[in-house]
A protein has these predicted regions:
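Acidic/histidine-rich helix-loop elements
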Residues: 17-28, 69-70, 80, 145-150
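Well-ordered, non-membrane alpha-helical segments in soluble/globular domains
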Residues: 26-39, 84-89
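A short, hydrophobic beta-strand-centered structural micro-motif
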Residues: 82-109
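A short acidic, glycine-rich active-site loop
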Residues: 74-89, 154-156
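Surface-exposed, active-site-proximal loop segments in enzymatic domains
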Residues: 20-21, 64-78, 113-123
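Active-site catalytic loop in hydrolytic enzyme cores
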Residues: 109-158
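Active-site-proximal beta-strand elements of phosphoester/diester hydrolases
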Residues: 4-26, 54, 120, 133-135
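Active-site beta-strand/loop signature of hydrolases that rely on acidic residues for catalysis
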Residues: 36-72, 95, 102-103
């Protein structure tokens, strides 16, 4: 006999995204995501409870590094986030408020690689905790400036 989970709705958002020049500006996109999540959860939950919200790539920071061909180190210093960090804490508040899992992505720093950023995706549970994290393995060359694990493989596998 199998245990079947209760039916639920998943919401994929397509928010307006503002390309940021400084990390502090990311909060503007997160505030907008809150409004979009609120509307989407209200409307979608008329049928089934929303248990999963997916935020698209670029929704936190935009694609400033790609559009303006930014220097990698400048992006690390000015825009890349920490996971966990201030921005993921704000997203965790959204997950708690709407009692849902939340998938998001961001270009983020790694403690072991302080001068690099990775394009990371992460899953936040309804308690606001990051429970899964993945780094993009195949950035779109030549436009994506993020590093992938293959670029630093020897140190990555230590």
């Amino acid at each position: 006999m199998t245990n079947q989970i209760e039916s639920y709705a998943a919401v994929g958002l397509s928010p307006t995204v503002y390309g940021v020049q400084k990390r502090e500006q990311i909060k503007m996109n997160i505030d907008h995501l809150h409004s979009v999540c609120k509307a989407a959860c209200w409307l979608t939950s008329l049928d089934l409870p929303v248990r999963l919200i997916v935020i698209p790539e670029g929704a936190l920071q935009g694609f400033t590094d790609e559009v303006f061909d930014m220097d990698h180190q400048k992006y690390v210093e000015d825009i890349a986030i920490d996971i966990p960090g201030e921005e993921t804490n704000l997203l965790g508040q959204l997950a708690r408020e709407f009692n849902t899992y939340l998938v998001a992505s961001a270009k983020a720093r790694e403690t072991e690689f302080p001068r690099l950023f990775f394009n990371s995706i992460f899953l936040i549970n309804p308690q606001g905790e990051i429970v899964l994290r993945h780094r993009k393995n195949s950035p779109l060359f030549p436009v994506e400036h993020s590093v992938c694990p293959h670029d630093v493989w020897d140190k990555w596998t230590q």
